[in-house]
C-alpha cells in the first residue's frame, strides 16, 4: 500500500502512519517540510527511499489566469456539526450555527464595509467559497453586492487559477 493523501499533513501522525502500524510501501508527500517530517526515521520508521516528494498532481494542469478576484475559502469545523445523517449522507449542523464564532467571523468579514469599499475602489470582486460541508449553510450568511457565493461543485482549479488572492484559515485550500 502507498499512502496518498488529499492534503498536506499538519499534525504529528507518526503513531497512526508509522511503520509499526501501517507498514506502507511508500508515502507520497506534497511539500518539502512535509517530506522532511516523514523522513524522520525515529518518528515514522521508514527509509527515505520510501518517502516520495511529488507535489500535488492535481496542480500539474493548473493554469494561471489571475483576475481581480479575492477568494475567501474557510474550512469546516467539526464543532459546527451535530451528527451524521446516514440517509442523506451529510452532516447536520448544530442548532446554534448562526451564533458560532465561525459564522460571526466570516459573516462579519464578507460584509465588512472597509473590505467592500476597498474592493469597489480597486475594481476587485470577492468570492466566498467555504468547504463543501459548510456550503449547505450559505443561505445563512448576509449578502451584499460585492461578494459572490460559490456553491458546492464549483471547480477548485478555476477558483485557484482566476484568483489573485486566496484567503483561508488553517485548511489546505
Label the model's feature ranges.
Residues 25, 68, 163-164:
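Conserved acidic residues
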Residues 20, 118, 158-160:
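Structural alpha-helical scaffold elements that stabilize or flank donor/cofactor-binding regions
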Residues 137-152:
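Nucleotide-activated donor-binding/catalytic signature segment of Leloir-type glycosyltransferases, i.e.
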Residues 7-10, 32-35, 57-59, 75-79, ...:
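Short, solvent-exposed loop/turn segments at secondary-structure junctions
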Residues 1-62:
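Active-site and donor-binding regions of nucleotide-sugar-utilizing enzymes
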Residues 3, 154-173:
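A donor-sugar binding/catalytic signature common to diverse glycosyltransferases
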Amino acid at each position: 500500500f502507498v499512502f496518498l493523501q488529499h492534503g498536506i499533513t499538519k499534525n504529528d501522525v507518526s503513531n497512526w502512519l508509522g511503520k509499526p502500524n501501517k507498514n506502507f510501501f511508500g508515502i507520497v508527500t506534497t511539500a518539502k517540510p512535509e517530506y522532511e517530517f516523514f523522513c524522520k526515521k525515529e518518528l515514522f520508521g521508514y527509509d527515505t527511499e520510501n518517502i516520495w516528494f511529488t507535489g500535488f498532481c492535481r496542480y500539474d494542469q493548473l493554469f494561471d489566469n489571475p483576475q481581480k478576484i479575492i477568494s475567501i475559502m474557510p474550512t469546516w469545523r467539526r464543532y459546527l456539526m451535530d451528527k451524521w445523517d446516514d440517509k442523506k449522507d451529510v452532516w447536520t449542523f448544530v442548532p446554534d450555527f448562526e451564533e458560532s464564532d465561525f459564522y460571526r467571523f466570516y459573516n462579519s468579514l464578507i460584509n465588512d464595509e472597509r473590505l467592500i469599499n476597498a474592493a469597489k475602489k480597486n475594481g476587485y470582486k470577492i468570492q466566498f467559497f467555504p468547504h463543501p460541508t459548510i456550503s449547505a449553510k450559505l443561505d445563512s450568511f448576509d449578502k451584499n453586492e460585492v461578494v459572490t457565493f460559490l456553491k458546492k461543485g464549483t471547480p477548485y482549479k478555476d477558483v485557484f487559477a482566476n484568483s489573485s488572492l486566496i484567503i483561508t484559515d488553517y485548511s489546505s485550500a
